[in-house]
Design a protein with these regions (language model features):
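Short, acidic Ser/Thr/Gly-rich low-complexity loop/linker segments typical of extracellular
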Residues: 367-372, 378-398, 419, 488
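Short, small/polar residue-rich loop motifs at catalytic or cofactor-binding pockets
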Residues: 356, 380-382, 468-470
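Short strand-edge motifs at loop-to-beta-strand transitions and within beta-strands
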Residues: 394, 427-429, 492-496
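Bacterial Sec-dependent N-terminal signal peptides
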Residues: 1-23, 440
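Short beta-strand edge segments in extracellular beta-sheet folds
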Residues: 418-425, 432-434, 522-526
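C-terminal outer-membrane/trafficking sorting elements
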Residues: 372-377, 399, 404-416, 443-452, ...
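Residue-level detector of functionally pivotal "anchor" positions at catalytic/ligand-binding pockets or at interdomain
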Residues: 348-369, 429-452
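Feature marking well-ordered beta-strand scaffolds used for ligand recognition
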Residues: 20-366, 386
């Protein structure tokens, strides 16, 4: 089922970085380069004594490092594996589980590494290769305790293998999602599995209450491609979805109804570089953004994500498959790990800075009607703009104490306002635009435009007063998309035919010849 879209704008309002800076609110504590080629996946482990460890997918194996209080790193073990540019890791209990696309004899499958003897040693416990030879990604349920790991993109099925690791020395496959196309990555919350169907450009949502019998709830299509990875907020009301292709934005969805996700926001730090992997911890999301490094978003309001920190790990040009591959922000100390392709493991600290947000509405100063498609420009980013939705709404956020906004709409005088902001809170504002007065374009009283019946089955009749030449009308969907339009209205009676228009709520908007909103009224088809 396709998703629905609410008003969305690129996250251009999040920040205005200085060109010379490569970090904001993120401090580098430690770094480790295995020196054997490209690095990739990373994960964390905490021993019974509270010591913290980082695990890094290196070119020739898995590096295991103890993290000191200040972020200093000491290698405690290195578990060899088939050479590969891609090595992914997760940890369940006292064991790490590692997959790679590297080949070897015997077939590598999934390595199981016993971490319980750290810091003295770590050892390969077993290799599970009865269900697959190689795998691209391995995941677990990050926010719940489950005895399962999930392996995606395998050479045998290209699907998702559900492996019971309650006995780490004897893993057992207990489920398989094999849709007949390639699943690149997945994310698990409770009994729900989200699967990235890379080449299909869809996200599959499954009920895995019975791991042996995954049930497809929804196959969500959207205007992206190369569906790559995703993560959910702690309350599981929102999901952040990334595409592995330069030039594509990442998207935030309201998933309170899994059968009909609603897109509520988008994000990119730089369209030239793809958004690779998201990791959510509390009110923050930590994103690996390839050549743009680590990016931190404040998602206190997931529908208005605001960038509040970053650390650039790549000195070259933006774009392509370089820079930061993975991150892991789940250590009790709050330290953040990252696997950078060129030079290995990074350890960071983020200072938990939050943004201030604004929630605005643009209205007609005379009629009070919301103004659709008004253009809102942030002074710090004059080349980019946000457009109001069918409610005249717009929103944004910033680390600054105040932002200056300019609001414009044809048929109205433009207006510039300064909005004071406070970290961690939201400010509501109303911007009233004054119509450019002419003898024939004053707003209409709502009672002079009558629509009936509504709700309607097949058609709605609109009774209109005498209108100036050049008056136009449009029927908008609740997503702000045009459904029908009428040009040069010269009649007092207009019929809105339903035709193939789906049942639902719509908005009838009447415009003056200069683009001023004369009236806005709801239309409902049953």
């Amino acid at each position: 089922m396709p998703y629905r879209t609410l008003f969305v704008a690129l996250l251009w309002w999040a920040f205005a970085p200085l060109p010379a800076q490569n970090t904001l609110n993120v401090d580098l504590l430690g770094q480790y380069n295995p020196g054997d080629g490209r690095a990739s996946g990373s994960w964390s482990y905490v021993g019974a004594d509270g010591r913290e460890y980082a695990l890094l997918g290196a070119q020739t194996g898995t590096a295991i490092l103890e993290i000191g209080t200040g972020g200093d790193l000491a290698e405690r073990a290195f578990i060899p594996g088939p050479p590969s540019n891609w090595r992914e890791i997760t940890v369940v209990g006292d064991h790490a589980y590692v997959v790679t696309e590297g080949s070897g004899s015997p077939h590598p499958g999934m390595q199981v590494i016993d971490l319980s003897n750290l810091p003295q040693s770590a050892a390969l416990s077993t290799t599970f290769n009865t269900a697959f030879n190689r795998g691209h990604i391995i995941q677990k349920a990050i926010f719940e305790d489950q005895p399962y790991v999930y392996v995606c993109g395998t050479t045998t099925t290209s699907g998702v293998h559900i492996i019971d690791v309650s006995d780490p020395a004897n893993p057992q496959q207990v489920g398989l999602y094999q849709p007949g196309y390639y699943i690149h990555d997945c994310h698990v919350r409770g009994n729900i599995l989200f699967a990235a169907a890379f080449y299909e450009g869809t996200m599959d949502i499954l009920d895995i209450s019975d791991p042996a019998n995954p049930v497809l709830l929804n196959r969500m299509s959207y205007p992206g491609g190369n569906t790559h990875s995703m993560s959910t907020t702690l309350d599981m009301d929102y999901l952040f979805l990334c595409d592995e292709q330069d030039g594509l934005i990442a998207r935030m969805y309201d998933i309170t109804d899994l059968t009909e996700p609603v897109q509520v926001a988008t994000y990119t730090a730089n369209l030239q570089s793809l958004v690779h992997n998201p990791y959510i911890r509390g009110d923050f999301m930590f994103i690996t953004h390839n050549t743009e490094g680590l990016r931190v978003l404040d998602i206190t309001d997931p529908a208005v994500p605001v960038e509040v920190g970053y650390f650039d790990t790549y000195a070259g040009q933006s774009g392509g498959f370089s820079g930061l591959w993975s991150a892991c922000p789940y250590l009790p100390s709050g330290k953040i790990l990252g696997g950078n392709r060129e030079d290995g493991l990074y350890v960071w600290a983020f200072n938990n800075t939050k943004a201030g947000r604004y929630y605005g509405q643009v209205i007609d100063s005379l009629s009070g009607a919301p103004i659709v498609n008004a253009v809102v420009t942030l002074a710090d980013n004059p080349g980019l703009a946000q457009t109001t939705d069918f409610d005249g709404a717009f929103n944004g956020g910033s680390l600054s104490d105040a932002v200056t906004l300019t609001v414009e709409r044809s048929g109205y005088e433009s207006k510039t306002v300064e909005v004071s902001l406070q970290s961690g809170t939201g400010t509501n504002i109303t911007v009233a635009l004054r119509p450019i007065a002419t003898a024939t374009t004053m707003p209409l009283e709502d009672q002079t435009v009558l629509l009936y019946p509504t709700p309607a089955q097949q058609s709605v009749q609109v009774n209109l007063p005498d209108l100036p030449k050049g008056t136009t009308a449009i029927l908008l969907s609740m997503e702000g998309q045009p459904v029908q339009s009428w040009q040069e209205l010269n009649t007092n009676l207009l019929l809105i035919e339903r035709g193939h228009t789906p049942a639902g709520k719509y908005l009838f908007v009447l415009y003056s010849p200069t683009g001023q909103v004369l009236t806005t009224q709801p239309v409902v088809f049953q």
